[in-house]
């Protein structure tokens, strides 16, 4: 019998230029809200807020 996955792959999008720079694995069980992280965007060439897409 196959168990359900406890993690899923998400993509982070830059708020300024809307480029999809990062992909992460997120736990379905512990984190219910959308992820927001300040990371470096290579297109903007600065640190910007990146949000999770669905």
Swiss-Prot record:
Task: Please provide, alphabetically and separated by semicolons, the GO molecular function terms listed in this UniProt record.
Answer: structural constituent of ribosome
Highest taxon listed in the record's lineage: Bacteria
Signal peptide limits: none
Q: Which UniProt keywords apply?
A: Ribonucleoprotein, Ribosomal protein
Gene Ontology biological process terms from the UniProt entry: translation
* Record bears the keyword Ribonucleoprotein: yes
Database matches in InterPro entries? Ribosomal_bL33, Ribosomal_bL33_sf, Ribosomal_zn-bd
Note the Pfam families from the entry. Ribosomal_L33
- GO CC field: cytoplasm; ribonucleoprotein complex; ribosome
Protein family membership:
Belongs to the bacterial ribosomal protein bL33 family.
**What is the name attached to this protein's record?**
Large ribosomal subunit protein bL33A
Organism of provenance: Mesoplasma florum (strain ATCC 33453 / NBRC 100688 / NCTC 11704 / L1)
């Amino acid at each position: 019998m196959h168990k359900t996955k406890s993690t899923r792959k998400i993509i982070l999008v830059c708020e300024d230029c809307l480029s999809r720079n990062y992909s992460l694995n997120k736990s379905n069980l512990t984190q219910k809200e959308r992820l927001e992280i300040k990371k470096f965007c290579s297109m903007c060439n600065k640190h910007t807020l990146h949000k999770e897409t669905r």
